[in-house]
Structure formats: structure tokens, C-alpha cells
């Protein structure tokens, strides 16, 4: 009896269609259509069309078409779009068809230069299409896509492997490109305007407000920190960020840069992408109170000021634009000696003291007269 049951089970197994996914270790899911996705990072609106190709490497000849994906100049930030892969309506044979899928270009093409760059995806995928005889007709029974290289062209194990090919946000059949333009270069990064020559991507200047009564040291160095949050797909090295004070230029490699400025000095940053969020902080300094005038993307001047002496001044959460970006810091000086009396108020203190002394002398004089 047991032998009969086993034989029946084997017969049913042979009669059922074999899942082509079984070779991949998954017999529960089959996919019969595929979607490719494209992510475009840009802080500057660009009309761009990206193209892809599926090169056949195994199986009878059967061409697969991957549609272009287009972004408009209003698609800024990080945007993702998907397109459905087109397979032949008729297949020559049953079996496995293997394709290598890559990105082939962008239209219009952008030439990488000193102030702009299009970072193209180097990702590569293997797409295996399984065709079976279903109802006396050859049709797709399963599609499996594996990533073999990531967007940087690397084959790291944690960034490769089988990917989702559905028409959902889980889709991993993805190519990511980034367009980056240097801040401050204007609308034509190939030919930056005169403001860029003067201010670069961002200019931070320093001065001390002085008058005849002040004894401020104009050779004193004030400490600053500039923090950067770079747009998606970029970092300090993408356009070679640098900081220049006078004849000294330093490369920036991280997300923070410290520097010192004296009265009348400035630091000019270059190589910072449009869309970089900045925070500029002047450290608290005894006897000094800070204020700043801020212009971002050549917009309206904004004032930032501290209300007390010896407090840090921070200009925060500003996003660099294509046009002029400046932070002009001014310090007001008031000397506070160990007595705690501010020198600018000393004359008033002396006047009060003299009045008090005169009052005491008058009272003493009156007492002596009364005693007589």
C-alpha cells in the first residue's frame, strides 16, 4: 500500500510543472514581469533622459527592451521613477535566457568639469528569464534578477545579490545617478560669474567694530567652525572642497572644518555643492559680542545676533544656492576688568561715585554745624 502511495506521489510530481525558481532555492514565488527603477539626485533642475541596455549572453536570440526614464527640471532633490521591461511576445525556444543589464548614458550629455559633474551609475545586473511551454504556448514562467555590481562598480557582498523587480517602492533593480554643481557659480557652471571669483561657494568674513574709546586687539584670532551636510550622492571630495585664507589653502575631507580669522580677514570656500546645508559658529570670546549678516543664493540679507557678551554666535541651517553665499561676522568689543565693570560704562560709574562722595561730605558738614 505504501509503495502505491509513493508511486502516485511521484507520478503527480512529474505531471506538475517544475518551478524554475527552484534552482534559486525559492519554490514559493515566481515573477513574470520586471520593472527597472532610476534614482536621480540633483539640487539643480535638469531635464535628463537616462537609457539602459539588456545584452543577451545565453539562450536563443530574443531581444529585450528597457524603456528610457526621463526627469524634468522640476524633479529636484532625490527622485525615483520606474519603467516596465518589455519582453518578446513570441519566444523561439523554452529554456533560460540570460541578459546583462547596464545603464548606457544620459541625454543631454554633461561633460564633467571643475564646477559640475554627472556621476553615472556603474551598477550591473544579471537578468535570467525562464520560458516554459504553458498551454501549448511558450511564455515566461519566472524572472530572476541579481545585482553583480553596485553603483560604484564594486562587487561587495553586502551590496549585491538578488533584487526585487516589482512595481513598488521595494524595487531594487535600480540605477542611481547624481548631478552636482558647485554653489556660487551661477546658472552657467562652465563659465562662473564675477561673484564666484570673489566669494567662491561660500565666503565667511570677520571684522571688529571699533571706535576711539575701544582698546580691542585687531590682531586677535577668533575661532570658527563650519559644519556641512552634503546633498545625497555627494561629499566633500566630489568637487574637491577647499578653504582659502589669504595665500593658504586647505582641502576639506569631512563634514566639519575649523579655522581662525582676525579682524579684516575672510575664508573663501570652494568646491561645495549646491544644496549643501551649512552651520557657521564663532566660539564664545570674553568681552566680545557677535552678530552676522547672511546672504544665501544672492537673496535678502538676514541679520543674526547674540544679546550677550562671551556667547557663541551661530548661523545655522542655511542651504547654499547657485548664486552668492556670504556670512559677514562683526564683533562688538567691551572690556570687562576683574572688577566686573565694563569700561564703556566706567564714566557713569565714576559720576555716581562722585555724587555719593559729595552727598556724604554734605551730610558730615551738616552734622558738624548742628553739633556746634
Where are the language model's segments positioned?
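Solvent-exposed loop/turn and edge beta-strand elements of beta-rich ligand-binding domains
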Residues: 1-372
Amino acid at each position: 500500500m505504501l509503495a502505491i502511495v509513493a508511486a502516485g506521489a511521484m507520478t503527480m510530481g512529474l505531471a506538475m510543472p517544475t518551478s524554475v525558481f527552484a534552482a534559486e532555492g525559492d519554490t514559493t514565488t515566481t515573477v513574470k514581469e520586471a520593472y527597472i527603477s532610476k534614482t536621480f539626485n540633483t539640487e539643480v533642475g535638469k531635464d535628463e533622459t537616462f537609457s539602459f541596455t539588456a545584452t543577451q549572453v545565453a539562450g536563443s536570440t530574443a531581444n529585450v527592451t528597457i524603456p528610457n526614464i526621463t526627469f524634468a527640471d522640476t524633479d529636484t532633490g532625490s527622485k525615483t521613477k520606474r519603467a516596465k521591461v518589455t519582453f518578446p511576445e513570441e519566444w523561439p525556444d523554452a529554456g533560460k535566457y540570460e541578459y546583462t543589464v547596464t545603464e548606457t548614458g544620459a541625454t543631454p550629455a554633461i561633460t564633467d568639469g571643475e564646477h559640475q559633474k554627472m556621476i553615472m551609475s556603474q551598477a550591473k545586473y544579471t537578468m535570467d528569464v525562464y520560458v516554459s511551454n504553458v498551454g501549448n504556448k511558450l511564455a515566461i514562467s519566472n524572472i530572476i534578477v541579481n545585482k553583480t555590481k553596485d553603483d560604484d562598480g564594486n562587487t561587495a557582498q553586502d551590496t549585491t545579490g538578488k533584487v526585487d523587480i516589482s512595481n513598488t517602492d521595494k524595487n531594487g533593480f535600480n540605477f542611481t545617478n547624481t548631478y552636482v554643481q558647485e554653489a556660487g557659480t551661477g546658472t552657467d557652471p562652465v563659465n562662473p560669474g564675477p561673484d564666484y571669483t570673489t566669494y567662491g561657494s561660500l565666503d565667511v568674513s570677520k571684522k571688529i567694530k571699533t571706535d576711539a574709546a575701544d582698546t580691542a586687539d585687531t590682531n586677535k584670532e577668533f575661532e570658527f567652525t563650519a559644519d556641512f551636510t552634503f546633498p545625497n550622492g555627494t561629499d566633500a571630495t566630489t568637487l574637491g572642497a577647499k578653504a582659502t585664507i589669504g595665500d593658504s589653502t586647505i582641502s576639506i575631507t569631512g563634514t566639519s572644518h575649523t579655522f581662525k580669522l582676525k579682524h579684516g580677514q575672510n575664508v573663501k570656500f570652494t568646491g561645495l555643492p549646491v544644496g549643501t546645508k551649512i552651520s557657521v559658529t564663532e566660539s564664545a570670546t570674553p568681552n566680545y559680542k557677535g552678530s552676522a549678516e547672511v546672504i544665501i543664493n544672492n537673496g535678502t540679507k538676514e541679520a543674526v545676533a547674540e544679546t550677550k557678551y562671551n556667547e557663541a554666535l551661530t548661523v545655522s541651517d542655511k542651504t547654499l544656492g547657485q548664486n552668492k553665499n556670504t556670512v559677514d561676522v562683526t564683533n562688538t568689543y567691551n572690556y570687562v576688568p576683574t572688577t566686573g565693570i565694563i569700561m564703556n560704562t566706567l564714566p557713569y560709574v565714576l559720576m555716581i561715585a562722585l555724587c555719593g562722595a559729595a552727598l556724604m561730605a554734605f551730610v558730615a558738614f551738616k552734622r558738624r554745624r548742628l553739633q556746634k
